[in-house]
Amino acid sequence: IKVVKNSIAQIAPHYTMKRQLDDYYSKFYCKLAKRFQTLAANDNAKAKEIAAWKEDVVAKWDSIEIVSCDKVEELKNGDIESGKEYTITYVIDEKGLNDAVGLELVTTYTTADGKQHVYSVEPFSVIKKEGDLYTFQVVHSLSNAGSFKVSYRMFPKNPDLPHRQDFC
């Protein structure tokens, strides 16, 4: 009880309603107000531009093609050594989306209760662009031994979206 009372006496004065409001303003309200001003400027020009971009991505998304995938046999067979670096390269035809695609390597592991968890997410870098063909590359290395699954995630990207979930 003495420890609890001491903790309340030492910590509680720092968590006031004023602090909560200050945190809210600095973390949320001010950022949202600035974003609104950007989107609403010039008769909502930026908002209309983003909406048109989203419609374009939706219209072309299913036509995106993976032209080639270059990875070593160990990755194809699932025999990855801990500590060894593997280079993975994908060439993707974005079908006119103009650098609107991002690619990630997602590594997962399964716990004893059968649940799958994300171990790491590594973004691919665009190393080359020829027309609509974008070459993505990542150097992948696992630092721990164990049983892992590797998959790839493709997603729409735009510097005007503050979060990936804003695409919806």
State where each predicted segment sits.
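C-terminal amphipathic helix plus adjacent low-complexity
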Residues: 1-102, 108, 158-161
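Surface-exposed loops/turns
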Residues: 82, 144-145
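Hydrophobic residues positioned within well-ordered beta-strands of beta-sheet architectures
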Residues: 88, 103, 136-138, 150
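Solvent-exposed serine/threonine-rich low-complexity stretches and specific carbohydrate-binding patches
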Residues: 115-130
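Aromatic sugar-binding surface patches on proteins
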Residues: 128-138
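Short beta-strand elements
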Residues: 140, 158-168
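Short, aromatic- and glycine-rich surface loops/edge beta-strands on solvent-exposed regions
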Residues: 145-157
